[in-house]
Each structure stands twice: as C-alpha cells, then as structure tokens.
Curated annotation (Swiss-Prot):
The gene is eme1. It comes from the Eukaryota. Gene3D superfamilies: 3.40.50.10130, Crossover junction endonuclease EME1, DNA-binding domain (1.10.150.670). Residues 245-268, 289-363, 375-397 are annotated as: Disordered. Its EC number is 3.1.21.10. It comes from Schizosaccharomyces pombe (strain 972 / ATCC 24843). This is Crossover junction endonuclease eme1. It is found in: Nucleus. Interacts with mus81.
Length: 735
C-alpha cells in the first residue's frame, strides 16, 4: 500500500493479490483505471510528515474485506476470493440509485479525495520529499465524501488544478520495504478486535472543537494528526448508518448518528449553508494566508475520469464500497455550519494592537542597547549594579577631568602667549614714560578731588594711573607705588615674569610754599623740619617743590614801595633811603644759598614752581621719570652696550646684534666674517678683552665658512679689527 499526498487528496493504494515477483513482472498494472481506487473525500488533509507515517501504517488496510469480524492483514487480504455477498449487492444498488444525485452537485465546489487502491503498498521513503504533513488546521472549502465503485459508481471530477496521481507510479517498491511488513504474521482474533475498537475510538470519539496547534514534538504531532483526522468526524458520522455493514469491520462499532438534514432535497437549506461557508472560508483564508501547491506524480485529464473501463486483473476479487451521495452532502453541510466557529477564534488582531506591540518592541530594543552599553565593561562581574554605578561615576569624573584638562591646556597656551607678548614689551630696547605710567600708583593724604590734587589727577588719568588715599602721610605730600610682574635676571640680562605684586618706589615729594620755607629759615627751624621729613619718608629720596618764590619776592617789593609812598604823602621823613636791599632781611641771593646748602646737607632734590598748575606739571614729569627709573637702573648693571640707545649703530635691531653690525662697518669685513667672529664672542667687552690679552693677530685662525669652501680670517683683517676697537695705529686702517 502506498500513500500519495496532494493539497486536495490523499491517495492510498490498497493491497494486491499478487506477490512481489508477480507485481514487478506484470506490466498490465500500469494502466489501472481510476475506478479501481476507493475514493473518500475529506475536509482537511494535513500535509504528511515523517512522524505521522507510523500512524497511517496502522490503518492502511482496505475498508472492505471478506471477513465480517476481524480486520484482515495485508497478506490475508491477498487471498480473499471474489465472492459477492448479499450486502455487496445491496451497496451496489444503493450506489446506482444515487448516481443522479451525484451529477447534480455543483461542479465548481472543491473536491478532495482519498484514493484507496488495491495495489501493494510502496515504501514511504519513496515518496517525494516536498510532500510533508503540517500539523495545523488548514481551512479549505467543504468537500464531498464519496466512495467510488469499481463498476457503477461515478467519479467526482476535480478542479482544473487538481490531478489524480497514478496509483501504481511506484510499483518498483518491494513489499519487504513496506511499513506493513509487521503484519506478515496473522495476529489472534482478540488482538485484531481490540485494534479495531481502539481505532474506532480514535477516529470517531474525538471532540470536534479541538484545534491543531503546531508543535515540534513527535508525540504531539501524532496526537495532532489523530485530532486532524477525527476532528472532521462530521464527515464520517453521517455516513455511519450506510457504511455500518457486515463487510466493513473497521466501522462496525460506530454508533448510529441521526441525520442532520432529513430533507435532503431542499435546495434552500444547502444554499444557505453554502453562503455561510463561503464567508467563513474567506475569513479563514485571509487569516492564515494559505497557499497550496499541487504536486502530481502522474497527471490525468478529467476526461479519463468520465470513462471507466473494467479491469480483469486479480484486483477484481476485492469488494469496493459504493459512493454515498446523500452522505457526502450531509457531511459537507455539517462542516459548513461548524466553520464560522473556527473563523471567530482566528480573527486577525486590530491594527492598533499591532502598532502598540511594534512600539513596545522598539522600546525594548533601545533599553537592551542601553543596558548592554552600560554593562559592557563589567560583563563578567556578579555585582553588576554596583559596578555599573561606579563605572558611570568614574566615567563622569573622567569626562569632567578631561574637560578641565583641555580648558587648562587652552588657558595655559593663552597665558604663555600673553606672557611672551609681555616679555617682548618688558625687554624692549627703547622704552618711553607713557608705556611705564600704567604701572604706577599715586598715594596722597587728602582726597584727590580737592585743591591742587585734582589738577594732578586730571593730567594723569589718560595714562591709566591709580590714585589711592593714605592718611598717614604728611600734608601736601605724594608717594608712589609700582605694580610689578617681572624680575630682572642679571645672568641672562633679561626680565622674567613673576607673580604680580606691589612695591614702594624710593621717592617722596613734598610741596612747600616759599613763604613757609623762608619762615623756617628765619626762625632757624629748617634743619629740624627736613630731619623730620627724612624720618617720615625713611628710605626714600625726598623731592621738595618750592612753590611761589617769584610771587613772594614780588609781593615783598610791592609792600616796601607802598610804605615809601605813604611816608612821602604824609610829609614825614621816609624810613627808607637808598636801595631796597638795605631794608630787606631775606633776599633772593640768601634764599638760593640756603637751597643749595639743604640739598647737599640733607640730600634733597629741590625744585621751584610759580603756581599750582606748574606744580602739577612737575609732579607728572616726576611720575614718568620714576616709572622709567627701574628699567634704567637695571640697564646700568647689564652687559648691554649703550650704542643702540645712542644710535651709533642704527642697523642693530637688538642688543645681541650690535657687535655683528659694528664689525660690518669695518672695511672688507663681510657678513660671513662678522658671523664667524660673533660665534666665538657674544658681546663687545668679551671681544675687547680677548684682543687686549692675545694681541692684534689673535683672530687669524678664525674659520670662515661659505657655501663653497672654508678658510681662515688671516692676519691682515685681524690687525684691522684690533686697531678699530683699541684705537691704535689708525694709519694702518688704510687699504
């Protein structure tokens, strides 16, 4: 017996009465007509799987046998005689009476058949590999249940896309490789009866509402296949009253099922069922999106099914079941009524639910990515949460530190750039008062907005000077401070940057009117006054501004002239006779001599002014000189020559280049010669010291390099350089 599967039918070849040798040798079996097959249409034909073959092997015997009590084995089936009983005649008459009903069926309805042939079973392994059983419910259009007779039963013509496979297409398979070889030995009668009863329980007593979930377990697949066959019990149960005959041992124990449609001629009922079935089937097909491909072993045209020729082979001995048209209609209508229940349970979910599920899935994917990134450094650590937090904290700190480091580097670069500019300004060769006034801070005992301080401030505001009030100072005095951010390095003869701070300048200015100064001299208190000022401005050079000397002597002369005029006008004898110098106790000459004495004895710088405006101008000038004094002071102790400041060597842009440009002024001294001498002597004093020590030919062996060759300076140029710097034998300078 061989099993052939398509999307629309399952064809099972029944056993033959011949042996293996006879089946292989007889070529007449190739043309066995389709009428020799027992055809049963089923609702759902699950695709075959290798796990389900064992189940099919157990009940793959013919439906009709010569015995009424036992289920014959394949080998016993081959020895059945061709005797027809009364029951067979009854079935044939019933089949012939129902032919007219069969022809009235709708030809467009889909019919799937199970073909039971009387040929020997082939090996299951010889079937095509692409034909597999899928253990899930396959919704299809309801079909007709039909049992074809050998002679008188008509055959239902299938659809255009359905072909019936040749039952003997694989006749070369041996009987020894058949799954039915386990039935070679005839079992006892009781065992066969038990098998028949158990098969009936499996096929007919299964719940109709069971569904077929898809599982991978072989046991589950077997059970699902049983359910798939028996869940369509509506196909077989209406047939039980007609099939339950003495010749059918397999279905003899089935209980009688009442007919669901007693009025079988009513076309309205069938049309109503067809409409309902059509709607439910469309819903199921849209839900499952099933596509079926029909694989045929031996395609046959529908015309072959209409003409059936009798066969004279050994298979005539088998008694075949007639086709029951009424039962097929009942099973089809019964299944149509049950389809909407399945379709309701398999409705597609709404679009909103799928959209929400998709959004949730996207969120889960994002969360998984975040978790995998955060846990990446600590995949093997058990304390994941604690490590993760520590890692995040360290990551934040590292990022913060990186930002701080980058900012520090940027600030350091900016500071270096700024410092380099400052150093260039500080080490500038030529410096002016205006450039240095921004470093000065002026201190006064009174408010700078009062009296003559306001005049000083108005003139120094444009130089960015600072003004501070210091109440500890004497009246009409000014002191200076400097904001310093560099230090002079005597070894390199350059200023270097340092921390900015304030330092007091060693200068103090005292403003004194000429009338007060003469009063101190007349009262012999001038020395005491200057000692007191030196103590208050200790460590500072005192600057004295005598304000109003010309005005004082002018007013004194005017006073004497007024007294003389008053005496003459009154007629009295005038007190003054001769020159005015006879009557003046303090003259200009005496004042000048006292100023010179105080300046030498007390080391005081004394200067005179006519009024407050001139005093303010003097203070501005003193402030500029004090601002420049620091740089002049350090320039005296440096090894830099003063020729650049004076302007003797105009081409020297820097002090270090002064010697080079001085040598170039000498006749026949080229830039290469000057560079060679400057490589050995970095300053003018060092060159002069060398010439004085080693004589006039001390530069003879100086190597002069050019792009072509090297040579020595020679004695002639050595003597010329010696005479130029030491001013000896000027006549030898001539070429």
């Amino acid at each position: 017996m061989t099993l052939q599967s398509t999307d629309s039918a399952i064809v099972i070849d029944s056993e033959a009465d011949v042996d293996i040798s006879s089946s292989q040798a007889s070529p007449s079996k190739d043309n066995i007509a389709l009428s020799e097959h027992n055809v049963i249409t089923v609702l759902d034909t699950p695709q075959r799987s290798t796990q389900c073959d064992s189940l099919l092997k157990s009940f793959s015997t013919p439906l009709v046998s010569g015995s009424e009590d036992v289920l014959p084995s394949p080998r016993d089936a081959l020895n059945i005689t061709n005797k027809k009983s009364v029951t067979d005649n009854l079935l044939l008459s019933l089949t012939s009476s129902n032919q007219s009903t069969n022809t009235n069926l709708n030809p467009s309805s889909r019919v799937e058949i199970i073909n039971l042939n009387s040929s020997p079973p082939n090996s299951l392994s010889s079937q095509p590999k692409h034909q597999e059983f899928h253990l899930f419910h396959t919704p299809t259009i309801p079909r007709t249940t039909q049992l074809s007779s050998k002679t008188s039963s008509p055959i239902v013509i299938p659809d255009d896309n359905e072909q019936v496979a040749s039952p003997l297409s694989k006749k070369a398979a041996s009987l020894t490789s058949s799954p039915l070889k386990d039935f070679q030995s005839s079992p006892p009668l009781s065992t066969v009866l038990q098998k028949s009863h158990s098969l009936h329980d499996i096929l007919l007593d299964t719940n109709d509402d069971d569904h077929f979930p898809f599982t991978q377990s072989p046991l589950t697949k077997t059970k699902s296949f049983n359910d798939a066959l028996t869940s369509s019990s509506s196909i077989l149960k209406p047939c039980m009253p007609s099939i339950a005959s003495p010749t059918s041992n397999r279905l003899s124990h089935a209980p009688s099922t009442p007919n669901l449609f007693p009025n079988q001629d009513s076309s309205n009922t069938i049309d109503l069922i067809n409409n309902r079935s059509k709607t439910s089937v469309e819903n199921q097909e849209r839900t499952f999106n099933l596509t079926s491909d029909v694989h045929l072993d031996s395609p046959t045209s529908p015309s072959k099914h209409s003409s059936i020729e009798p066969n004279t082979s050994q298979e005539d001995s088998f008694q075949e079941l007639p086709s029951l048209n009424k039962l097929s209609i009942q099973s089809r209508a019964f299944k149509k009524m049950r389809l909407p229940k399945i379709s309701r349970t398999t409705d597609t979910p709404p679009a909103s639910t799928s959209n929400s599920n998709k959004k949730n899935l996207d969120k889960l994917k994002k969360m998984r990515k975040l978790c995998s990134r955060s846990l990446e450094p600590y995949e093997l650590d058990s304390n994941t949460q604690r490590k993760r937090k520590r890692y995040e904290d360290s990551l934040k700190k590292s990022k913060t530190l990186d930002k701080v480091d980058s900012l520090n580097r940027k600030m350091a670069k900016e500071l270096d750039r700024k410092n380099s500019k400052e150093l260039q300004k500080i080490n500038k060769v030529k410096r002016t008062k205006e450039e240095c006034l921004s470093e000065i801070i002026l201190l006064s005992p009174d408010d700078w907005a009062s009296s003559w301080y306001s005049t000083v401030r108005s003139q120094l505001d444009s130089y960015n000077c600072q003004f501070v009030v210091n109440s500890n100072q004497p009246k009409d005095s000014i002191m200076w401070k400097r904001k310093v951010n560099n230090v002079f390095n005597s070894s390199t003869n350059r200023f270097e940057l340092s921390i900015e701070h304030e330092q007091i300048e060693p200068f103090a200015l005292l403003r004194l009117k000429c009338r007060d100064f003469i009063k101190y001299i007349e009262e012999d208190q001038a020395d005491t006054f200057f000692h007191e000022m030196s103590e208050k401005f200790k460590g500072c050079k005192l600057i004295l501004l005598l304000e109003g000397i010309p005005n004082y002597f002018k007013s004194l002369k005017a006073e004497l002239n007024r007294q003389y005029a008053a005496a003459v006008n009154s007629g009295t004898r005038p007190l003054l006779f001769g020159s005015l110098s006879k009557y003046q106790n303090f003259t200009k000459e005496k004042l000048e001599s006292e100023i010179v004495r105080f300046s030498f004895e007390h080391s005081i710088l004394i200067n005179t002014s006519n009024d407050e405006k001139e005093t303010a101008q003097w203070i501005v000038s003193f402030t500029g000189d004090i601002a420049l004094s620091r740089y002049k002071h350090f320039s005296k102790f440096s090894a830099r020559a003063s020729t650049t400041e004076i302007g003797h060597v105009k081409s020297a842009d820097r002090i270090e280049n002064s010697l080079n440009f001085m040598l170039r002024q000498i006749l026949r001294v080229t830039p290469n010669i000057a560079n060679a001498i400057c490589d050995q002597f970095d300053s003018i004093p060092s060159l002069i010291h060398h010439l004085k020590t080693h004589g006039e030919e001390s530069l003879t062996n100086v190597v002069i390099q050019s792009s072509i060759s090297e040579r020595n300076l020679g004695p002639v140029l050595s003597r010329r350089i010696y005479n130029t710097f030491l001013c000896k034998e000027a006549s030898s300078d001539a070429p």
